[in-house]
């Protein structure tokens, strides 16, 4: 990780490979290597390695408890898509929801309660959005998949991302118009709003500043 933070990416990858050769069942170097692969656009190797996140110390036991198999691209199936990580990650990976919905006969999505109005407004009315896990019966789906695993199935290459629609979220037009009226009465001005809150506990949080 020290080499990675210094920008010595080639050396960092070599260190990860060395760690893997010493202890092949240790998840951390696989996961860290996946982040490097994804950062540099090597999705073919990065996404499969990213699945090691579930075996890292911070994620052990956090996955969905179910007897149903992981969805790997099966057509016309009943699929349960469940959220992981933070609300920002849910929004980011949600761009792939329409592609998943095209593959399913029925899709249920568990997400943060705060996102349900946004997602219901932005995506197909056929999708069942839930925030309460207890309301999703295991009998209601054939396969499941965590939201951050979607790219490994549906966007395995950079070209897949380039071909995807650039906008996928729809604002509440009434609230947007009301906010515009509050902010400014000058219709000739362009209004730009930036509002975000994320965990400051993350080691890389200081890199997110836009000062």
Question: Locations of the language-model features?
Answer:
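Alpha-helical solenoid repeat scaffolds of the TPR/TPR-like class and their adjacent stem/linker regions
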Residues: 1-211
């Amino acid at each position: 990780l020290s080499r990675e933070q210094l920008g010595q990416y080639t050396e960092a990858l070599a260190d990860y490979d060395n760690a893997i050769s010493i202890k092949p069942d240790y998840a951390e170097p696989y996961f860290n290597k996946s982040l490097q692969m994804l950062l540099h656009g090597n999705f073919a190797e990065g996404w499969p390695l990213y699945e090691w996140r579930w075996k890292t110390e911070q994620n052990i036991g956090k996955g969905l408890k179910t007897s149903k198999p992981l969805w790997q691209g099966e057509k016309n199936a009943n699929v349960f898509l469940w959220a992981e990580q933070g609300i920002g990650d849910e929004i980011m990976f949600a761009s792939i929801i329409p592609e998943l919905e095209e593959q399913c006969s029925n899709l249920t999505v568990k997400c943060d309660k705060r996102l349900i109005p946004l997602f219901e407004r932005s995506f197909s009315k056929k999708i069942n959005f839930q925030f309460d896990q207890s309301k999703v019966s295991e009998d209601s789906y054939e396969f499941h998949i965590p939201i951050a695993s979607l790219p490994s199935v549906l966007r395995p290459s950079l070209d897949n991302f380039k071909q995807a629609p650039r906008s996928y979220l729809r604002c509440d037009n009434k609230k947007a118009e009301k906010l515009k009226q509050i902010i400014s009465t000058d219709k000739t001005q362009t209004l730009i709003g930036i509002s975000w809150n994320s965990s400051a506990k993350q080691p890389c949080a200081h890199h997110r500043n836009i000062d």
